[in-house]
Amino acid sequence: MSLNLDKDNRDLSSNQGHLGEFRRGLENWPPGLVWQPDGEQIEAMVKLYQGVLVGNARLNLTRITAPLDFLEKHLWDSLAGVLLSDHSRNCPQARVIDIGTGGGFPGLPVALVWPQWSVALLDSTHKKINYLEELGHRLGLANLAYLVARAEAVGNQPQHRSQYDLALIRAVGEGVVCAEYALPLVKVGGTVVLYRGQWSAAEAEQLERACALLGGKVSATVAAVTPWSGAQRHFIYLTKEKPTPSDFPRAIGVPRSHPLGVEN
């Protein structure tokens, strides 16, 4: 699949109003995240939005395409998970992996805002990763890597296991499933960010039990309200305290079918 935004602009002629509304939203970025996009970042994010709209006409990248929804549920949410952590302030260099990136979130916005970080986009769907690679090149993002694989497989590969400073995982599965996918990939002392909507005490207890088996702990839970719709979001931060036992991650499909920490 070839990405040519000049050609594909014809397909977007009916969406010029959306692009304008999206740009205005960026130019009036809400306070609260101790970050504001500069002019170069605004232009890059408009191109990102445009590229996702083009890709969405061919692939099921995302159901979220309305300008303010995209700003809030993709850009704001993607960046909030990192900006509300210590990594945005204390890690001038970082190796990051976005597990189950789908349409490129949170990895693409993170790569745009932190060009000094190396960001790997991981997804099991070839067509999505192929398109994201073309979009990344169009955006000039030299700090991206692209992986087509299942998280369980990558977590057992020496070139990826315990190699990342930060793992981001959003809309992939239950919290305990996400922990089993992500903790094997980060270094001891590294951080996993789980992006969640509602978050219950029962889920928190299950996650604590799972993390204990995986060599990690829940270090923080941050609740936030989205700036446009007022929806509730939770960002769960896991810290890896010791190496994950070689038993984890388990075989492909097992973390989801038999989640850790869940009492039957």
From Swiss-Prot:
The keyword tRNA-binding does not apply. Gene3D superfamilies: Vaccinia Virus protein VP39. Its EC number is 2.1.1.-. One of its GO terms (molecular function) is rRNA (guanine-N7-)-methyltransferase activity. SUPFAM superfamilies: S-adenosyl-L-methionine-dependent methyltransferases. InterPro entries: rRNA_ssu_MeTfrase_G, SAM-dependent_MTases_sf. The keyword Methyltransferase applies. S-adenosyl-L-methionine binds at G100, F105, D123, S124, T125, A151, E152, R170. GO terms for cellular component: cytosol. Its main location: cytoplasm. Pfam families: GidB (PF02527). Keywords: Cytoplasm, Methyltransferase, rRNA processing, S-adenosyl-L-methionine, Transferase. It is found in: Cytoplasm. Specifically methylates the N7 position of a guanine in 16S rRNA. Belongs to the methyltransferase superfamily. RNA methyltransferase RsmG family. This is Ribosomal RNA small subunit methyltransferase G. It comes from Synechocystis sp. (strain ATCC 27184 / PCC 6803 / Kazusa).
